[in-house]
């Protein structure tokens, strides 16, 4: 026991670990025959915290295989199997390249990705889900808001600032993150010939993005401050950031047809151009070549920095119904969870799900339109439900989706009556 006298008859207590007296520390904690000071407790906490952090980093270091990545994507994204396979391999190779620096002197190039597919086909969700499984920072940018430096609009380096914000300005983490740039087709060059006038939101932005995507050291103001000459900038190397660009590329199928069907002229060519079902468009996009993207309006250097290109198919009715019900975070499950918090069960009948999918197809918004349709259907019920008592179940059928009737509310007393009636 760490005790001793101080000459006045009072016993002075000492820490059993560092030997400091009770007068030298803020707090001395007593245990069975031992004492420990606040400084030693803090030191022990630091040691445990450091060891836990190292163990956590070792666990995180394991890179999932392409199959594991694809299986994880299956839990959140419906369909698009070919795109999932392409993405899984590209992402696996990218992070394997970072983990194992080449020992034989072979420099491995970065495989940035271009996703081509209609609105609501799952481009953004695929990129977000990839970042989740790999546990890396993820930032999104809209290409339509970007302009060249010096013009009114968003500077391309703001993309890196968004990435830094997602990881609390940890530069090392940000340098291994994923950036998704949406609406990339909207910055295509306005014509085949380079214009003598400035194309502030077209070719100029492609040139600015080109440096960022291929790898440069971007100067970013710390903690979201504005740039000014006296400020210290954070230096972020973008060489190892994975860039995924996405866009609908409306009319790209026509560019491909023009190239592949040059032999078809006259009446037969007109017939072919009118025939544009979803399946046929998907087949045509499957024949995509780099020259088609250049013809569409992307500059050759930009196309060259996006070596992995994959297309996503437009979602049909069956896929939209699956999206409503199957994924871990399916929309119907989300709303059912909200209603459960109010003590009510939410039921969607099969014909209601079909009607919702048909509405989304009519709006040509793909999966993106599903939430707004559901919000609209359930708005009045979500407004009234917290004020109502004894609502056990809310039922949505086809007539509710089509606006012909209101959701069916089943009260607790109604269920009791039906239960007692069945007993009689």
UniProtKB/Swiss-Prot annotation:
One of its GO terms (molecular function) is zinc ion binding. Pfam families: AAA_2, ClpB_D2-small, zf-C4_ClpX. InterPro entries: AAA+_ATPase, ATP-dep_Clp_protease_ClpX, ATPase_AAA_core, Clp_ATPase_C, Clp_protease_ATP-bd_su_ClpX, ClpX_bact, P-loop_NTPase, Znf_CppX_C4. GO terms for biological process: cell division; proteolysis involved in protein catabolic process. Signal peptide: none annotated. Zn(2+) binds at residues 15, 18, 37, 40. The keyword Transcription regulation does not apply. GO terms for cellular component: HslUV protease complex. Keywords: ATP-binding, Chaperone, Metal-binding, Nucleotide-binding, Zinc. Residues 1-56 form the ClpX-type ZB domain. The keyword Chaperone applies. ATP binds at residues 118-125. Belongs to the ClpX chaperone family. ATP-dependent specificity component of the Clp protease. It directs the protease to specific substrates. Can perform chaperone functions in the absence of ClpP. Component of the ClpX-ClpP complex. Forms a hexameric ring that, in the presence of ATP, binds to fourteen ClpP subunits assembled into a disk-like structure with a central cavity, resembling the structure of eukaryotic proteasomes. HAMAP family: ClpX (MF_00175). This is ATP-dependent Clp protease ATP-binding subunit ClpX. It comes from Legionella pneumophila (strain Corby). The lineage of its organism: Bacteria, Pseudomonadati, Pseudomonadota, Gammaproteobacteria, Legionellales. The gene is clpX.
